[in-house]
Structure formats: structure tokens, C-alpha cells
Amino acid sequence: MLISPFRAFALIALFSLCLSKAQAQLLPTPSAGEMAFAAGNLESAQKFYSAAVKAAPEALAPRLGLIRTLMRQDNWPEALAEAQAAALKFTTSADAHGLLSLALIRAGWSGEYIKEAAQSLALDTNNYWGLLATGRAAEWEGDYKAAHCCFWHASETHPEWPEGWGQLLVLEDDTLTLKEATQIAAIYLKLDPHGHPHKEIVENARDITENAAAYQAFFSGSKTFQRIHSPLAPGTESLQSSSTVVDFLGDFAIFPVTINGQPFRLLFDTGGGDDILLFWNSAKRLHLPSLAHTHIRGVGGSEKSDVLKAESMEIAGVPFRSIKIVTADSMLDKTDGILGGNILNDSVVTLDFEKRTALLTNGANAQAPDPLSGDKSITLPFHYYHGCLYIQVAVNGQALWALLDTGAFRSTLSLRLAREQLRGLPKEDIQTGTDTGKRGIGSSDNKMQYIVSRYESQIQLSQNPPVYIPIDTAGTSDLDRQISPSAQTDFEISLWMGMSSFTYARRITFDYPRHLLTFEYKEPDLAPAPGPAKK
């Protein structure tokens, strides 16, 4: 059963009363670790908790505090190790199993995270960490209503803790109204959370509270805060196809898009979520007032953005209305901005790299086109999560989740995975360094660690038939820090698949309604390959 935001405010008030001077004497004296954690001094908290665990190995509380602190530091490998040890030692602790499930999720949906979450709630149906883990698992599977219920229940159980409120703010939940989002943001900000992933959620919460009036006034016809665009002609009753010639800049597909009657060239970006992003010099052509401010994020961190509203948009003959536009100071040559793939989430999108065209198909019978004569194809399911696409692949035999990003050129391994893949190889063939300078969207982070090696790896798309794509490990980067720990995804992404991987196919199809990815290829182009090879 859902609780109302007004009841949530009552819970917060009740918690505040519990901390009144009259009752404070009845509460146990907080430990040094707890005080450091509450103050946001996570480094000190880790030291205090580690010392407490060493001094009292049979005590559960300092172990739980240490795991929470490591998670806030986004030191998930150590958090996972501590959580596994705690769940093994304290088998009847719902907290230990719940935190272990969350650590497994952060590690990339690895292991038995569902089993651990279920074990937590079997021991205590109201366990905070078990509810959060169950909600995260439901969200990953697209069951937003179940996730919503879990996060509300967790927030009701511990209104003084920020994780539940934060998850409600980043949840893609169509039942959350702007008014409710504003109220939750106020509760969340009052708790003043520190560490991971709260820095980004705090930015989001401030954007919501500061701009609520503007959003309410200009997008009042929308039921939800996030999704404010809707097609004029859904085309769900019959099959409708439209082909458009796209201008490929290198391997990037540039779609012709009309906004308020003005032509724009937008890069089709499956990693761009549900945004229409215009570079500011191009956005000026629309002569639209800035309605509000928000933060947008990319490999360069975050940057502040203006929010605009356009009345109409057309993509390959498909019209849309009530268009939310965000702006960026970034620039890409010969383009006006980015078309987030989630805008076309009712369509089947086929990119033909030989004909240099894109085919958009709508309707109940829409699907990938049949392979051309002599071609083969494989179809893989993808997870559709916060507007981005993820497929499970293997790199040199290691299973992992890969982000599909048509807005990126190179396919990139994370530093963590690259180090694992290159372990034991001659050191003279491997170099590390730090790159500085502007990269893509975002302006808050201009440093990226990298590894350069003389070895290649392969991405295994499928086992039957065996299909591989080569990847150059010189393209490794710090995905662990710059991509994975976002407030929305918050799980380990080991591989970033850019257009350099897609163009090994003749055609690729993104079937958004059915969550399917189809690679059409010629036999020699995607063939079995041996293990890591020296170049």
C-alpha cells in the first residue's frame, strides 16, 4: 500500500520529535563511527568502524556501519567483501543480507542479489536494506510499480535515512506527480545526505524544488515530471513505416529533425535518455525563453542547462508535441545537438550502414527487417533501463553488462576490467596515464585515467552462433567512476559499446517495444576469434 507524501511529512516530524532534548537522554550514545558518518566525514567513519570491527569481531553493528560507509565512498569491491563476510557470519541478520544484495547490484547485478534480498525480507518484512534491494531489482526488470512500493515502504520504515527518498526521486515512475516529487525532494534535502550517489541526487532534488513552479506552469498537461512528450499519431493499431536519409558523420547517424518548423541535425544517441539536447548556439534559432534550469551529465561530468519548451517536433514524418529541450554549451561539428534514443521508444529503428539510411517502423507488427540475401543475423534481448540499453555479452569469457551507445565512437573497457584482462602480461606492453581536457557533455570533470596496451580483446555477442567483435584495449577508460556511479544506473558497467562496434554489422535494429537488438552481418565480418592478441 502506498503512503501519501503528507504522511511522509508526518513521519519526518515524528522522527524529529524523537530527537528532542527531552528524549535524547534515552537514546544510546552514538559511536565515533556513527558521528563521523552523520557529519559526512566518511574517511574518518571508515577508520572508526574498521577499528571497531577489529576490536569486537562478534559485534554486528560496526560491520553494518562499515559496509554503509564503504558504499557511500563508492568503494564497492571492499563493501561487497565485507557484506559477504557479514552475511556468512550473521546468517540471521536481515540487515546483512539486504546490504549484501545492494553490494551485488552495485557490482553489476552479479551473483545471487535476488536471493539475498529475498532472504533479508524473509527474516524481516520491514527491513530497510532488503526493501531497497527488492525495489532496485524490480526497477531493473521494468516493474516500476513494485519498485515504487518498496521504496515508499523503506522510507516509511526509516524516514530519517535518505536512500529510500533518493531512489523515489530517480525512479522512472509515471505515478509520481510533480507535486509529489517536489515534496519528496524537500524531505530528501532536509536530511542533507553525503557521499555516493547522493551528490547527483542532491543536484536533481534542488532542480526540482527550485523550478517546480515553472514546470507546473508550462507543462501542466503532463501527468509526470520526466516524460512530457507524446506523439500526435501513435500508430499502434497498424503497421506504419517511414524511411529517412541520415547523414553519417564518420560512423555517427545524424537525423534530420524539425522543431517548431525549424530544421535541425541531431545525433541519434541510444545513451542520451529521453532528452532533446540542443547546443546553445543552435537553440537560439528557436527564440524560446528559458523556463528553468537543470543539470545534464556526460563523460565530462555535469553542467548546468536551460530548459526550453517547443510546441512541435517531427522525426522522419512522425510528429510529436509538448517537447522538452535541454541546452548545452558543448559543441559537436556539423550537428545541432543530440536526439535521445528514448524519444523513439515506441518505434523500431534500423540503421543501414551501406545505404546510409534509417528506417522507423511503428505499430503492433513492427520488427527488424529480414536479412538481405547472403546475410546472417542475431537477435539479442536488451535491458531498457533509465532510457539506456544494456546487453549481456562476454569479453574473453567473462560475462558482463555492456552499455549500447550510438553517441560514442569507440568501444571502451572499464579500467577495472582492462586490468583484469591484462593481468600477467609484460609490463612493457602496458602504459597508464591521465588525459585532461573537454570531452563531450559535462564540464565538472576534465580528467580521465586510461590504459594503453598492445593487446586486443573480443566482445562475444552470442555463443550459438559464435559471433565476436574485436575491441582495442587502448580504448580503456575510467568508466567505473564516470559512467557507472550515476544516481540512476548505479551499477558497474564494464563495457561501453560505441559505433565502432556497431559498424561491423551491415544493419542494426533497435526494437524498443520488444527490447530486442538485431545485428545483420556478412559471415566474414563477425566471426569467431581467439583470445587476447598482440597487435
Give the ranges of each region predicted by the language model.
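N-terminal secretory signal peptides that target proteins for export/translocation
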Residues: 1-5
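Bacterial N-terminal signal peptides
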Residues: 8-21
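Alpha-helical structural motif
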Residues: 10, 29, 451-453
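N-terminal leader/linker segments that initiate helical-solenoid repeat arrays
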Residues: 22-65, 72
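Pepsin/retropepsin-fold aspartyl endopeptidases
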Residues: 43, 47, 51, 65, ...
